[in-house]
Amino acid sequence: MVKKYVENGDIYWHSFPHNAQPELMNQAFLVRGVQSSQNLAKKYNAPQISKVLSQRDVPGLTLGSIVPLVDNGVIGISIGANDFSPPPIVPSTMDCYVKGLRTVRTPFLWKDVHNNKSIIVDIHPGG
């Protein structure tokens, strides 16, 4: 029964098998996690394979995450930083601090200049 809902696109998951702390992983572990989610989507005939990594209740992740994610088909990261770990001051959260707004966000392109690879990031203050 679950397989039917996956095939219909009613059940969907992000590009990693769990809410992780990528800064604590080496590249091989990060790649393995992304591939695990991709393989699961293929196994259950999901209509598409997720290209966005979702992280919740984390303050962010390291620059070292960009290359293994991009090399394995991930094009975006959605970060939900809870109120106890404030999000970093980046373009997508600037208005939240400067003007006191919580709803104005703009995704930004995070680039690893050493490897010339980039990924879209959207940080959601408050989770």
State where each predicted segment sits.
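Catalytic-domain carbohydrate-binding cleft regions of carbohydrate-active enzymes
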Residues: M1-G127
